[in-house]
């Protein structure tokens, strides 16, 4: 019987709008500094809205899960030295801020 040696595929965030290939990410799509995005997640994507609406009342949903995973990987790589991973934490906070402001702006799309 052959043994499968392929690396397991991550199923934590199946959102196709999340770009996980670092070479393909364009963090500065324009010269306007307000449009810069320093995290791979898209917390306002239609899939994020659907998954939030479909979850149970006691379930937790994090549209910035990819940023959270990147923060944890950085901590593991750097022996849990928070100072070396500050940019990852800031990116996660920015993603959460974008998500919460989108929910506050139009809560009807998130229920």
Swiss-Prot record:
Residues 1-21 are annotated as: Disordered. A motif (Cx9C motif 1) lies at residues 64-74. Residues 61-103 form the CHCH domain. Keywords: Disulfide bond, Mitochondrion, Transit peptide. It is found in: Mitochondrion intermembrane space. GO terms for biological process: mitochondrial cytochrome c oxidase assembly; mitochondrial respiratory chain complex assembly. GO terms for cellular component: mitochondrial intermembrane space; mitochondrion. Residues 7-20 have a biased composition (Polar residues). InterPro entries: CHCH (IPR010625), COX23 (IPR051040), Cys_alpha_HP_mot_SF (IPR009069). SUPFAM superfamilies: Cysteine alpha-hairpin motif (SSF47072). It holds the Pfam family CHCH. Disulfide bonds join 64-95, 74-85. A motif (Cx9C motif 2) lies at residues 85-95. Belongs to the COX23 family. Required for the assembly of cytochrome c oxidase. This is Cytochrome c oxidase-assembly factor COX23, mitochondrial. It comes from Eremothecium gossypii (strain ATCC 10895 / CBS 109.51 / FGSC 9923 / NRRL Y-1056).
